[in-house]
C-alpha cells in the first residue's frame, strides 16, 4: 500500500518526504485555508517537493465551474489530480475531465455504491473516509473492504485512497482491507515510526556501547 500525506503544510510535506516513504499528497480547501496561502502557490510548491500525485480540490459545486477549475489546476503540473466531491454535479465533471485525460480523485465517499458510481464515471481515485464513518458508528474499514472486494471482482482499475485516517491502526486496517493508498496526517506518520520497545532497545544499545567503549561522539 502506498503512503500519501494529507496536509497543505509545506514544512510537514518536506519532513515526510525526507523519510523516503511518500508517494503523493492530498489537500483540501480546509487544509489550504489553514495555511492562509494562495491555492496555486501552495500546490506548485508541493509539486516541487514530491514527485507523485498531488490532489488539489475544486471549490465550486456546479459541474461547469468544476470543469473550468479542474482544467486550470491541471495546467499547474503534470502530477496534479483534481479532487472533486461526491455528488451528481461532481460525477458529471469527473466524466468530462477523465475523457480529457485529466486525473480525478472523488472525495467524501461514505459508501461502496458511491465508490462504484465514481469509478464508472472515470475517477482515477476514490477516497472513502474512515474516521468520519467511525464517528457515526459505521466502521469505516468495512466500507473500504467492500470497495476493494467489489473493484477486484469487476476488475475496476480505480484506486482506493483511505482517507480521514486518524491512527496507525487505521493505516494497518486499510492495508489489510485492500486499499491501494492511505493518505495520512504527518503526526500519524510519525506515530507509525515509534514503538516503546524500539526506544528501550536503542537506549540499551547506547548504554552497552558506552559501557564497553566510553561515550560515543
UniProtKB/Swiss-Prot annotation:
Q: Does the keyword Kinase apply?
A: no
The answer to keyword Protein transport applying to this record is no
What job does the chain carry out?
Transaldolase is important for the balance of metabolites in the pentose-phosphate pathway.
Report the InterPro entries cross-referenced here.
Aldolase_TIM, TAL/FSA, Transaldolase_3B, Transaldolase_3B/F6P_aldolase, Transaldolase_AS, TSA/FSA_arc/bac
> Which family does the UniProt entry place this protein in?
Belongs to the transaldolase family. Type 3B subfamily.
Gene Ontology cellular component annotations, sorted alphabetically: cytoplasm
A single GO molecular-function term is:
transaldolase activity
Q: Where along the chain is the active site annotated? A: 83 (schiff-base intermediate with substrate)
What name does UniProt use for this protein? Probable transaldolase
Organism lineage reads as: Bacteria, Bacillati, Bacillota, Clostridia, Eubacteriales
Task: Tell me the organism.
Answer: Clostridium botulinum (strain Kyoto / Type A2)
Spell out the HAMAP family in the cross-references. Transaldolase_3b
Describe the reaction catalysed, as an equation.
D-sedoheptulose 7-phosphate + D-glyceraldehyde 3-phosphate = D-erythrose 4-phosphate + beta-D-fructose 6-phosphate
Q: Could you tell me where this protein is found in the cell?
A: Cytoplasm
Annotated GO biological processes are:
carbohydrate metabolic process; pentose-phosphate shunt
UniProt entry keywords in alphabetical sequence: Cytoplasm, Pentose shunt, Schiff base, Transferase
Q: What is its main location?
A: cytoplasm
The pathway where this protein functions is: Carbohydrate degradation; pentose phosphate pathway; D-glyceraldehyde 3-phosphate and beta-D-fructose 6-phosphate from D-ribose 5-phosphate and D-xylulose 5-phosphate (non-oxidative stage): step 2/3
Q: What is its EC number?
A: 2.2.1.2
Amino acid at each position: 500500500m502506498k503512503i500519501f500525506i494529507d496536509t497543505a503544510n509545506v514544512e510537514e510535506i518536506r519532513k515526510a518526504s525526507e523519510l523516503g516513504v511518500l508517494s503523493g499528497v492530498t489537500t483540501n480547501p480546509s487544509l489550504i485555508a489553514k495555511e492562509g496561502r494562495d491555492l496555486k502557490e501552495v500546490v506548485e510548491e508541493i509539486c516541487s517537493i514530491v514527485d507523485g500525485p498531488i490532489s488539489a480540490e475544486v471549490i465550486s459545486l456546479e459541474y461547469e465551474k468544476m470543469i473550468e477549475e479542474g482544467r486550470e489546476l491541471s495546467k499547474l503540473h503534470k502530477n496534479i489530480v483534481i479532487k472533486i466531491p461526491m455528488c451528481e454535479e461532481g460525477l458529471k465533471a469527473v466524466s468530462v475531465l477523465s475523457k480529457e485525460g485529466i486525473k480525478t480523485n472523488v472525495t467524501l465517499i461514505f459508501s461502496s455504491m458511491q465508490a462504484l458510481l465514481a469509478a464508472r464515471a472515470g475517477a482515477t481515485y476514490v477516497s472513502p473516509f474512515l474516521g468520519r464513518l467511525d464517528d457515526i458508528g459505521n466502521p469505516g474499514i468495512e466500507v473500504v473492504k467492500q470497495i476493494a472486494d467489489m473493484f477486484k471482482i469487476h476488475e475496476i482499475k480505480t484506486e482506493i485512497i483511505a482517507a480521514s485516517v486518524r491512527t496507525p491502526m487505521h493505516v494497518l486496517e486499510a492495508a489489510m482491507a485492500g486499499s491501494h493508498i492511505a493518505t495520512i496526517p504527518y503526526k500519524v506518520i510519525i506515530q507509525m515510526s515509534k514503538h516503546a520497545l524500539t526506544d528501550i532497545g536503542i537506549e540499551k544499545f547506547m548504554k552497552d556501547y558506552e559501557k564497553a567503549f566510553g561515550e560515543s561522539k
